[in-house]
């Protein structure tokens, strides 16, 4: 142990170990802060979509994973947050993907009550062109609010299209692809929910398994 080279090697190894541990701690703390912030943002969005006066449960605690590529636009399992009152389901907020946006996937979430009425829609993530396709963001435009109160009468309800295609929804000047993809994605999610309510509400609450 009196060999200087051995001592220096041990000191370097100890220093490296301490640095690695410090980096791991900092990374974990950063991850926890990011996760907490994301959770707060999600809570805010869920409360925008599903009014607090119609449910008495914590939405993020009652979450199930749905998997249906045709309806949700992805092969991945997507979270769905169930609102209940006195233990009975009253509404749901489902995440879905519009896979055919102008610049790729658009991630959105749609709130629907058990009568099939849309309570609200919000955009969670997208890469659409600033100044054109980004009007799907509430902070840029109130376009997404046009879904509120809508009911899908049938799977091929012609009203659920942009006006250019004969429907009720405005298209954007110079950007028809984005709203067309968005309307189709919301329509698919709403139809899926209205046709599979009982099945969805009977699924296990398993969203934590996805995040572990």
UniProtKB/Swiss-Prot annotation:
The FMN phosphoryl threonine modification is found at: 176
Localisation: Cell inner membrane
The answer to whether UniProt assigns keyword Chaperone to this entry is no
Top-level taxon in the UniProt lineage: Bacteria
Q: What is its EC number?
A: 7.-.-.-
Asked if Transport is a keyword of the record, the answer is: yes
Top enzyme class, one word, equals translocase
Entry keywords, A to Z: Cell inner membrane, Cell membrane, Electron transport, Flavoprotein, FMN, Membrane, Phosphoprotein, Translocase, Transmembrane, Transmembrane helix, Transport
Which HAMAP family does this chain map to?
RsxG_RnfG
Q: Which family does it belong to?
A: Belongs to the RnfG family.
NCBIfam families for the chain: PRK01908.1 (NF002519), rnfG (TIGR01947)
| PANTHER family for the chain | ION-TRANSLOCATING OXIDOREDUCTASE COMPLEX SUBUNIT G
Task: Describe, as the record does, how this protein assembles with itself and its partners.
Answer: The complex is composed of six subunits: RnfA, RnfB, RnfC, RnfD, RnfE and RnfG.
Q: What does this protein do?
A: Part of a membrane-bound complex that couples electron transfer with translocation of ions across the membrane.
Q: In its UniProt entry, what is this protein called?
A: Ion-translocating oxidoreductase complex subunit G
Source organism per UniProt: Shewanella oneidensis (strain ATCC 700550 / JCM 31522 / CIP 106686 / LMG 19005 / NCIMB 14063 / MR-1)
Encoding gene, per UniProt annotation? rnfG
């Amino acid at each position: 142990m009196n060999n200087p080279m051995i001592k220096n090697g041990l000191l370097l190894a100890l220093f490296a170990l301490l640095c690695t541990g410090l980096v791991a701690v900092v990374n974990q703390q950063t991850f926890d802060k990011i996760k907490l912030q994301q959770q707060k943002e999600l809570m805010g969005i869920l409360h925008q979509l599903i009014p607090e006066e119609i449910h008495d449960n914590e939405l993020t605690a009652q979450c199930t994973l749905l998997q249906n590529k045709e309806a949700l636009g992805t092969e991945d399992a997507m979270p769905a947050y169930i609102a209940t009152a006195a233990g009975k389901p009253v509404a749901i907020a489902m995440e879905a993907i519009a896979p055919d946006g102008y610049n790729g996937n658009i991630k959105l979430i749609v709130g629907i009550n058990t009568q099939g009425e849309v309570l609200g829609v919000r955009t969670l993530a997208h890469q659409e062109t600033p100044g054109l396709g980004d009007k799907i963001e509430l902070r840029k435009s109130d376009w997404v609010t046009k879904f509120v109160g809508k009911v899908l009468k049938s799977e091929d309800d012609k009203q659920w299209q942009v006006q250019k295609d004969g429907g009720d929804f405005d298209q954007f000047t110079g950007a028809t692809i984005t709203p067309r993809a968005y309307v189709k994605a919301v329509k698919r999610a709403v139809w899926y929910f209205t046709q599979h309510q009982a099945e969805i509400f009977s699924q296990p609450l398993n969203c934590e398994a996805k995040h572990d």
